[in-house]
Design a protein with these regions (language model features):
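Feature captures hydrophobic
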Residues: 1-100
Length: 100
């Protein structure tokens, strides 16, 4: 998946799940995805909206695997396939949303 397809997939995930309540920035190898989950309706796009509560850095390929359930988030973190800066609890909440 390219970054636009990943962005759309995250929009679908956000629409199926409860409000996140935080801002998350995914920094990928070919761009970024910013998820603002602080409002009534999540806003997800490719513009950098500034500071996020949590920044997750990984490859686009690994984000695709994570969304589709083919990558265990804990193992990915422990093996360096993803890095988390900021609130770790937000990252954990996101991964539980992907599992639903």
């Amino acid at each position: 998946m390219d970054i636009s397809e990943l962005t759309e997939e995250l929009r679908k995930q956000a629409g199926r799940n409860v409000r996140l309540g935080y801002k998350v920035k995914f920094v990928l190898d070919d761009g970024l995805i910013f998820w603002d989950g602080t409002g009534d309706k999540p806003e997800i796009g490719n513009d950098d909206k500034g500071d996020a509560d949590t920044t997750i850095t990984m490859t686009a390929e690994n984000l695709e695997k994570l969304i589709q359930g083919g990558l265990d988030p804990t193992l990915a973190y422990m093996t360096g396939k993803l890095r988390v800066e900021g609130k770790m609890g937000v990252a954990l909440k996101l991964t539980s949303m992907f599992a639903d």
